[in-house]
């Protein structure tokens, strides 16, 4: 697997006053919380996790005639607005099947209604593998095993190993309200949308990511309307984690500190959802991602940004292959595609593998009817690291491009930092899409995506380097009014 966080050049600005953050509504919706000691047990030998897939949802007390029992009012309203019916995929995993697993002594960590699966943790590998013989279980696959904790070097980018130069901080005030590089908003035409009052108001965005360290205390994020948080890695505070990748991604979307940094959707509402485990690289993170996006659906979000991707893992036999990139094979890709079919616009980073042996997009960027975003530099050229397409079934990937080179973000210390990666191209584009969704609240997500692609500079000749190109979202807005 390749994780997509490229923080290269550290600059300075701003310290971090406190601000209150709204607590998550009590809408657990049958998603299992990890145990409090989960983090400490990550590195205990002889612990394994398995993905258990079920054949059906028999024995469930839930019914398609009573969807209010497992979906929020807002989630149901989104489906109704777009003429989408609740179906079997939306029914929770059978509680009877989960009880069977617990009665056998397994700890249930995650569950996915869309994949009809659960993740169990155990030291009993023979017992887990014998579940294959249970008549309602379709498959059992190992997705994680305990390992030694990885050493982290603070002088390196925490995921990619790029050295961070020791540069003198620049405390000068920017000339533009958008900060040191107004182009990072203007290249998508989003500044023009902002100028007419389209800043994401009324749109709810879920940010599925790694750590959101100190995102609740950074001055430039003080005004963000965070309506809820959720942690699918452990039971810790998402703001107290050691990682700040999610914080940097959030600043691309939601920062609002004029003459320092303004994001592309500073007036949207946000759920911050932690699914990425920095301690190791295993397929179980895809299961956490599925739980995260299903949670986002259940609370009624309109839009998802995910700057995560999965291809290669700590155990090579678990790696994905190109044949998996069909939008339906990897669990997270299936979940992304199903989210799209439920009226959610999913925006995902294409990946940073363009210059390594993999070269291709990752999962869930191969999802169907979503926007996979590659990275360009300030001159509009594709970056050396931006992942390539197509999907195995021949779909154009990436779908579109946005600035992913020397993007200005806030780090966990509240300093302005320049970062590289499709991780940052994705939220810049996602925020612009939120502005379009504000302008056209009844427009179907598939039509929003069509407008975005059609506005790309490469729309007449889409390829598997640029996709449909760099969108001009002002052009998309004008077209949408016709």
Regions found by a protein language model. Give the residues of each.
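Bacterial Sec-dependent N-terminal signal peptides
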Residues: 1-26
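Subtilisin-like serine protease catalytic core
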Residues: 45, 181, 191-230, 235-285, ...
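Active-site-proximal beta-strand/loop segments in catalytic clefts of secreted hydrolases
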Residues: 52-56, 122-123, 143, 207-211, ...
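Aromatic- and Gly/Pro-rich amphipathic surface segment
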Residues: 63-104
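Autoinhibitory propeptides
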Residues: 95-184, 192-194, 368
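Substrate-binding/access-modulating region of protease and related hydrolase catalytic domains
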Residues: 194, 256-259, 272-366, 392-395, ...
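Catalytic-core environment of secreted peptidases
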Residues: 216-229, 375-424, 460
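Hydrolase catalytic cores
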Residues: 250-253, 271-277, 360, 404-470, ...
